[in-house]
């Protein structure tokens, strides 16, 4: 999976200075997997109207579902979520998989009295990771 090209993708262009390796997972089941040696891992991503749900698996444990959409997602913006913290200083494997799960975006927006001005903008369920925040280092 190659990073989005800022010359061809408006979202990638908007965040190129902070997320030069921004990728877009668009199909359920698409996944990224990596290993790191260290004690902390978080994901730096873009959330917005097209946000979806991601299964986060650390070291083969039970997946944790993380929704990449919140009551402020009427526009795209930078965000983070933690994969693991205070981990043993060892090699860890992380898998991030886009889920097919539908969820009620209108109800989430209603928490702030927001509405879906153009429902088609909210129809997709994507995941846009662009960076790792590690206390440690990537390993092959």
Predicted regions and their residues:
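Glycan-recognition surfaces in beta-rich domains, encompassing non-catalytic CBMs
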Residues: 1-140
């Amino acid at each position: 999976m190659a990073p989005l090209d800022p010359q061809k993708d408006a979202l990638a262009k908007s965040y190129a200075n902070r997320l030069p390796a921004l990728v877009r997972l668009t199909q359920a089941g698409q996944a990224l997997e990596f290993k790191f040696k260290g004690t902390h891992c978080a994901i730096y991503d873009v959330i917005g109207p097209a946000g979806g749900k991601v299964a986060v698996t650390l070291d083969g444990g039970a997946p944790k579902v993380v929704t990449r959409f919140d009551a402020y997602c009427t526009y795209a913006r930078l965000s983070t979520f933690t994969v693991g913290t205070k981990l043993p200083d060892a090699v860890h494997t992380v898998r991030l998989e886009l889920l097919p799960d539908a969820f009620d975006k209108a109800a989430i927006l209603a928490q702030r009295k927001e509405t879906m001005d153009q429902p088609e903008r909210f129809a997709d369920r994507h995941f846009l990771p662009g960076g790792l925040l590690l206390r440690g280092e990537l390993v092959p």
